[in-house]
Amino acid sequence: MITNRTVDFFDTQFQRQVSEGKFALNPFEELALSFLCGRVLDLGCGLGNLSIEAARRGCSVLALDGSMSAIARIRQVASAGGLPVRAEAVDLASYRITEEFDTVVAIGLLMFFPKARALEMLEDIKNHVSPGGSAIVNVLIEGTTYLDMFEPEHYYLFGHGELQERFAGWELLESRYDNFDAPGPSVKAFATVIARRPQRAAPGRA
């Protein structure tokens, strides 16, 4: 499962955001919003700001996270608004996707696992995007020096260009790098990819 340090880090952050009423989309969620369509899987959804907004725009959303407090907040908002969001608390360290989605989102998630699990999850995401659908993936990469939210030896910083390379054969709709200042003299370095899975070839065609 995700380590206690990570769970505590995000639960504290979620509780602060709820108490302060801060539910704005972050820059990566803002970027993702216009690419969401159809059935959406939001892995590591946090407080569900993107899931809720996607549902308001007509998507049907499955929102998954390891934080019970975050899931409770999503259920409350979705129920009050009559929104098509199903929110479930799961152990993301062992979770397997069981159906295809038009859009699969994993913003700020994969780096919280050792390399083998991070790459396994990425392949699971790719394998469960419907043909013609999109994967939206955002990770921390090498060059990140703010590591307070990680358990030592229990995280993975992707290499520069690695995320893009792992979507070889897909159409890259967005590919970008962003650096953000973090507490102290440290930085968070991100890579974001929005990629469209190829359509299946028509029967009888190569």
Language model segments and positions:
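Class I (Rossmann-like) S-adenosyl-L-methionine-dependent methyltransferase catalytic domain
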Residues: M1-C37, G46-E99, F113-E120, D124, ...
